[in-house]
Curated annotation (Swiss-Prot):
Bias (Basic residues) ranges: 804-817
The protein, known as: Coiled-coil domain-containing protein 175
Highest taxon in the source lineage: Eukaryota
Region annotation Disordered: where it falls in the sequence: 761-817
Biased composition regions of type Basic and acidic residues, renumbered to the chain: 769-786
Coiled-coil regions listed in the entry: 130-166, 217-594
């Protein structure tokens, strides 16, 4: 990819070429090149895109949370600081290159021999750099192998999961079998309890029989006590012998230690004798180990005797209890004596075996004493040999004194030679130290750049993962929001339809109410007219009744004729009164209907107002959500652009990492599917058998632990990103320190070069004598053996060749005259 540099005047400039370093060297000192931005195109591209983000933040269209704004502003400030630090480093490197070019120019004035030596030093430094690069590549290959190994482990874990699924089914089957087995075992336990009760009764009878046998053991205890006394006496004798042996061993060890101190001063022959002494010491140690084994056996016998004592005490306590039962068991004991006599004979045989073992131990002690005497004789012979070696040692010490005198003379000669070659040594050492420091700095820079590259790639992968997750989440949220919006729109349409329908119904009800009001008014008027007519008729009838009451007596016959008419009139009156009541009830019902309609109309109006308010709030929320979504999409799109601009090196490796990421995603999806399957299986198993639920819970906890470990690793890798800024700051401080060192070195080199020029002018090459050159050569060889590392054999060869050439040149002018 093309490199892009940023400047405050022109902004970002595309530069496809690579600018060489501003260092003037000879043909053999061609240094590497570096890009225009010194590997900081990532920061430049990030700054360009963050400027776009700042513009969008300042605009009205771009709206987002305050936290996001602060986060982006902090990023812009950090990137600006990085850019400033980058510029400072570039300036420092340019100053460094100028100073190095000046130093190289001064070095060209140095004689050819020094110039060639410096060239060879630089070539070897480059070779060392190549070796270090190869080592780094080897480490990368190792990491790739580790990644492959982890992939193999993942495949194995998959197989393990499949095997666990099969085992789970088998465990479910086994659970059913175990339930049946439990039922069987419970039945067997019931049978066993019955058997235990029977055996308990039998054991009681057997205990009574054992009491009889213990009486017979009393005789055996008497014999055992006699043997114990004899054994104690033997033990005391052995302890006295062991003490004597220990004292003699300690004395001999002290003598051997004093003699070893004397033997350390000897040289080659004494070393051989040491080997023989060590072999003898090993033999003595083996014998001491055998003595320790005998002690352990004695301790074991002590423990056995104590156990027997305990048994005897327990038997004595039980004998008191059994004496009371003696009279009852005398009749039975006579029959079983024969069996117990046979047991007593077995005990006697065991005692005989123990006596045999004691005899074997005595034989071993005798053999050890014999071996000890043999070792004493060998040590006496060794003492004679040591005396002989001491005499030889004195002779060798005299030879060493002679050699030391010779070496002192040689050292004086070497010191005289060192004084003539000290100036050249100092120059050589200084140049080596400078080049070593430069090589170290270059290696550190290379390692840091590799670490940054790895960290940036890892951040890319993490950011892509996060972005993919965020996209997935946003898509889901958008789908949910879209569905909710569609539902809200459908509800809004339904509400509009219902409001229209209700308005139409309300208008109908209003029209009906108005018509009903008009009808009621007409009916009321008619009813009033009818009431007036009826009142008039009633008045007439009352007058007639009064008249007829007065004339009742006279006109009883006429009343008989008028009775049917009265009945008809009464019926009409009752019917009219009923019609009045029904009309009154209808009027009250219609009034209630009017009140209900008014309440319904009021409620519908409130609902319509609420719907309108809700639609406005929903619209506002939709607008706010759309703005947030647009802001987020723009911010993430810009972040993607930043990340794409940062990827300019090692596209093949990045593709491989992406493939691995896809594999990991597939594997995570596969694990999620398996977790879902396991959860479903868990539900089934819980329904079938509650005892197997803990296994599924354990598996789920393992998966959660793995995810937690993965998240912890991600956090650790994120924390390493903060360390990169600190490394940049430390690099700037180191560069300043390096500038100061280079200034001091340059001043020192200028003084040394001026001295060399003065020496070259004062003394010609012909004036150099053979002795000075020989001293210089010897000094150079000695310096090689003392100062140079084994990796600089080639440099030694070149220096030796130069010395030979100087010798030939010095001899040639002497031979000519």
């Amino acid at each position: 990819m093309a490199m892009r540099s940023w400047t405050p005047d022109q902004g970002f400039v595309d530069r496809k070429l690579v600018r060489p370093a501003s260092v003037s060297t000879s043909l053999s000192l061609e240094l590497c090149t570096f890009p225009s931005t010194l590997g900081s195109s990532v920061a430049a591209n990030a700054l360009e895109q963050l400027l776009v983000v700042e513009k969008s933040l300042q605009g009205d269209y771009f709206t987002c949370n305050e936290e996001v704004k602060t986060f982006l502003k902090d990023i812009t400030v950090a990137v600006k600081k990085l850019e400033e630090m980058r510029k400072n480093t570039i300036e420092l490197l340019e100053i460094e290159s100028m100073e190095l070019s000046r130093l190289y120019f001064l070095l060209e004035t140095v004689p050819n021999s020094m110039h060639k030596e410096l060239q060879e030093c630089i070539l070897e430094a480059r070779r060392l750099n190549i070796l270090e690069i190869s080592q780094v590549k080897g480490k990368i290959e190792k990491t790739n192998d580790e990644i492959k190994f982890l992939n193999d482990k993942i495949i194995e874990l998959k197989n393990m999961n499949e095997a666990l699924g099969i085992k789970q089914v088998e465990l479910a089957k086994q659970h059913a079998k175990f339930v049946l087995l439990l039922n069987q075992t419970l039945e067997e336990k019931a049978v066993a309890t019955i058997c235990i009760n029977d055996t308990y009764t039998r054991i009681k009878f057997e205990k009574e029989e054992i009491g009889l046998q213990k009486q017979c053991l009393q005789d055996a205890t008497d014999l055992i006590e006699k043997h114990k006394q004899e054994h104690r006496k033997k033990k005391e004798r052995l302890a006295e012998r062991i003490k004597d042996v220990k004292q003699s061993c300690e004395e001999k060890r002290k003598e051997a230690y004093n003699k070893r101190k004397e033997l350390t001063r000897l040289q080659n022959k004494i070393i051989k004798m040491k080997q023989t002494v060590t072999t003898n010491a090993v033999m003595i140690n083996d014998k001491s180990l055998e003595i320790m084994r005998l002690r352990e056996t004695a301790d074991l016998w002590k423990k056995k005797v104590e156990d027997m004592k305990r048994v005897c005490e327990s038997l004595e306590e039980k004998l008191l209890f059994f004496l009371t039962h003696k009279q009852q068991i005398d009749s039975v004991s006579s029959e079983k004596k024969s069996g117990f006599i046979s047991q007593i004979q077995q005990v006697a045989e065991k005692l005989q075996k123990i006596n045999k073992e004691n005899k074997d131990l005595r034989d071993r002690l005798n053999t050890l004493l014999k071996q000890y005497k043999i070792t004493l004789k060998e040590e006496e012979a060794m003492s004679l040999q040591r005396q002989k070696m001491a005499e030889e040692h004195q002779k060798q010490m005299e030879l060493l004194n002679q050699k030391e005198t010779f070496l002192t003379q040689r050292k004086l000669d070497i010191k005289n030679m060192e004084e003539g070659f000290s100036t050249l040594r100092d120059l050589n050492v200084a140049t080596k130290e400078v080049y070593r420091k430069q090589i170290k700095l270059l290696t550190e820079n290379l390692e840091r750049e590799l670490q940054r590259w790895v960290v940036n790639q890892w951040r890319l992968l993490c950011s892509r993962k996060r972005h993919s997750r965020w996209l997935h989440k946003t898509k889901l949220t958008l789908r949910k929001i879209i569905t909710e919006i569609e539902i809200a729109e459908e509800k809004r349409r339904q509400l509009l339809k219902e409001t229209k329908r209700r308005q139409k119904e309300i208008s109908r009800f209003v029209n009906q109410i108005e018509t009903i009001k008009e009808q009621l008014e007409v009916e009321e008027k008619e009813y009033i007219k009818k009431e007036k007519k009826l009142m008039k008729e009633l008045n007439k009838y009352e007058d007639l009744i009064i008249k007829e009451a007065q004339i009742n007596k006279v006109k009883e016959e006429q009343l008989v004729e008028t009775l049917p008419r009265l009945q008809i009139a009464e019926d009409d009156f009752q019917e009219k009164s009923r019609t009045l009541k029904s009309l009154q009830n209808d009027i009250s019902a219609k009034k209630q209907e009017e009140t209900l309609l008014s309440t319904y109309i009021f409620r519908y109006r409130k609902d319509i107002i609420r719907c309108t308010n809700n639609t406005e709030t929903v619209k506002r929320d939709m607008r706010h959500i759309r703005t947030l979504e647009s802001e987020k999409t723009q911010s993430h799109f810009e972040a993607l652009k930043n990340l794409e601009n940062e990827i300019y090196v090692n596209d093949q490796k990045l593709a491989l990492l992406i493939l691995e990421n896809k594999k990991l995603r597939d594997y995570l999806a596969y694990l999620k599917k398996h977790t879902k399957e396991y959860s479903e299986k868990q539900i089934v198993t819980v329904q079938n058998s509650g005892d197997l639920s803990w296994q599924l819970i354990a598996q789920h906890s393992q998966y959660s632990d793995l995810l937690a470990e993965f998240q912890i690793k991600i956090k650790e890798l994120v924390d390493t990103g903060e360390e990169t800024l600190q490394e940049i700051r430390s690099l700037a401080s180191k560069l300043r320190y390096r500038d100061e060192k280079i200034e001091s070195i340059s001043a020192w080199l200028l003084g040394g070069i001026e001295r060399l020029h003065s020496l070259m002018e004062e003394e010609s090459p012909s004036s150099l004598s053979k002795e000075d050159l020989q001293k210089a050569g010897m000094k150079q060889k000695e310096e090689k053996t003392l100062r140079f590392s084994p990796s600089l054999h080639t440099r030694r060869d070149t220096l030796s060749r130069n010395c030979k050439m100087i010798k030939k040149r010095s001899r040639s002018p002497k031979n000519k005259p």
